[in-house]
Amino acid sequence: MIQQFLKTVPLFRELDDDELTQVLMVGLVRRHPQGAVIIAEGTTGGQLHVIHTGQVRISKLVPGLGEEALTILSPGDFFGEVEFFDGSPSSAAAIAHCDCETLSIPHQEITTLMRERPALSAKFLWAFARTLAGRLRDTNEKMTALLAISRAF
């Protein structure tokens, strides 16, 4: 069932059935109840998480304000990519916004798989780059809007 779902996810859409099976073999399906902290801000976990069902809230703790939601992710979205690729601490928390299920893919496992399967690696990394480019574009638009608002004050 999750393999059919992954075929609809942009990150995995170009992978063939055998490649998807290989990804699923290194991944772990996890269920998270509403409010569960999947990734705590400032921790390192080295896993990429793909949302299968439910929603995940990405947030930061803002001094004097508390938790500030940055975005809410839905099925097909992924998170944890910063620490997954560069090993740095998480820049934000990921919290189950409602009951959800994720596919968690450990960095070491996918790295080994990509080394062994260059075609899978190329497809995966190209899809990943397209997704990140879209996120960067969205962030630039938000920053432009915030700068325009700040200049009004």
Residue ranges and their predicted role:
Residues 1-153:
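Cytosolic regulatory regions built on CNB/CRP/Popeye-like sensor folds
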